[in-house]
Swiss-Prot record:
This is 4-hydroxy-3-methylbut-2-enyl diphosphate reductase. The lineage of its organism: Bacteria, Pseudomonadati, Pseudomonadota, Gammaproteobacteria, Methylococcales. It comes from Methylococcus capsulatus (strain ATCC 33009 / NCIMB 11132 / Bath). The active site is at E126 (proton donor). Pathway: Isoprenoid biosynthesis; dimethylallyl diphosphate biosynthesis; dimethylallyl diphosphate from (2E)-4-hydroxy-3-methylbutenyl diphosphate: step 1/1; Isoprenoid biosynthesis; isopentenyl diphosphate biosynthesis via DXP pathway; isopentenyl diphosphate from 1-deoxy-D-xylulose 5-phosphate: step 6/6. Belongs to the IspH family. The gene is ispH. Catalyzes the conversion of 1-hydroxy-2-methyl-2-(E)-butenyl 4-diphosphate (HMBPP) into a mixture of isopentenyl diphosphate (IPP) and dimethylallyl diphosphate (DMAPP). Acts in the terminal step of the DOXP/MEP pathway for isoprenoid precursor biosynthesis.
Amino acid sequence: MEIILANPRGFCAGVDRAIEIVDRAIEVFGAPIYVRHEVVHNRYVVDGLRERGAVFVEELSEVPENSTVIFSAHGVSKQIQEEARERGLQVFDATCPLVTKVHIEVHQHASEGREIVFIGHAGHPEVEGTMGQYDNPAGGIYLVESPEDVEMLQVKNPDNLAYVTQTTLSIDDTGAVVEALKMRFPKILGPRKDDICYATQNRQDAVKKLAAQCDTILVVGSPNSSNSNRLREIADKLGRKAFLIDNAAQLTRDMVAGAQRIGVTAGASAPEILVQQVIAQLKEWGGRTATETQGIEEKVVFSLPKELRRLNA
């Protein structure tokens, strides 16, 4: 049984930054530090930060007065930002800069009077935050997930539309929705550069390469991680047995029964330690020393909020 590792895999620059913001805030201000929503969608990471003194909440009403609060990597709505400001809470924003880029696109289109079609998954915190950035009462922002949604879509002005996308979607699926939008609304504007983030694209390209070499794919990631789910779906669509597992404890012999080549990758919010634990388990079951595929070397680094850098200098 051969083990092949995807490259790149695991943490992206936005996740690294978000986790470091929480770590630094705890170091500087001491526990408790409040975090609105899970800072990243990974159980291992969240549990580790909770042990250090992070308190995860879903509503700002759960945050006591005079507290420090961190917004998660997924971003928040304008309403949440304003509520924190009105209450005088000390806020550190761990929103991924690539999500912030989409927020800026939404602001620009709204200020220029356009309505927006947002390609994303209902209920995901990034979607809720981005849709909550639209503030033109004369227009609207509409969520679609599929070409079928586009067919049913009703907007106020079909000639004055733009679209943006959730950063963690499948590139292939997004492309089909964009094509449907352009067919239905020929004048629709899109972003100058694709909203799908570099790390999402790189990991999807890597899992496709992995699927070409392996008969079974294991994706390390939590079930609420959008980009991890997309990796599993891509491998599945390519005809491979594909499983999403949080950690080695969820790995079963049935998953790898009869496999000659097992590919292992990890979502952008999954730490490498979990990948190594999965590899160790596979080796116990007879797997050979893992080899890595060649892939893009990621050198992207996002800086911390200047206030936190200054406080921690």
